[in-house]
């Protein structure tokens, strides 16, 4: 079976299919929110309970948070949201699209450290050292809401519920890291890939997608980098899953 650059696990048209931009580079666009044209606010966002859960905030508190999240940024596929070493200023809530985070070794090799989808936060890596420790790259045309961290921190000191929710987000990241350590330290290749696919299904299902269909925006090489597997091993494992009837591969569809 030939290695495809991207896998899709779906049998129906999917609005998140990557666009081919011909390798062109684009200047980042930071767009101010215009309430009369396209209101983007935490209080009316259908991803708010996934991104920064604010269900316990009062109406006035939500309005303060809406003022804080006052801009968004559009990125093309392959564009960097931030890179390792950049000053840490903001968190980024993924509104649409898909990202990967990666770190580079001294010999120039890239290691994928995570994949982020709509409703998840990017930039938490920069809190400790006031600089980002990884690159964040858009895997498809994407959009993020910009959350200035200093202002969020100040607002959290005023609103205990917001502070509590932010602590829960940090805890969730720690639990995720523990899960990755378990994945890499004790599982065979088949178990790693199966756990990876199931995790994506669960996260997408929380966003309203089917539990039996999945879209992969990353290449097999990127999956292998994340799972600590060689490209050939990832390809063989996908082939084995298909032979055993666990999934069906048809070009970009699985």
Where are these regions (language model features)?
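Glycine- and acidic-residue-biased ligand/ion/polar-headgroup-sensing regions
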Residues: 78, 89-102, 118-119
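Cyclic-nucleotide recognition modules
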Residues: 112-179
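Basic amphipathic alpha-helical segments that dock to polyanions
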Residues: 240-241
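Short phosphate-coordinating micro-motif centered on Lys-Gly-acidic
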Residues: 80-86
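Short, Lys/Arg-rich nucleic-acid/phosphate-binding segment
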Residues: 250-254
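Polybasic "coupling" helices that flank or enter modular domains
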Residues: 157-230
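Glycine-centered, phosphate/nucleic-acid-interacting loop/turn motifs that mediate DNA/RNA or nucleotide
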Residues: 245
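Cyclic nucleotide-binding regulatory module and flanking cytosolic helices
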Residues: 22-77, 121-122, 126-128
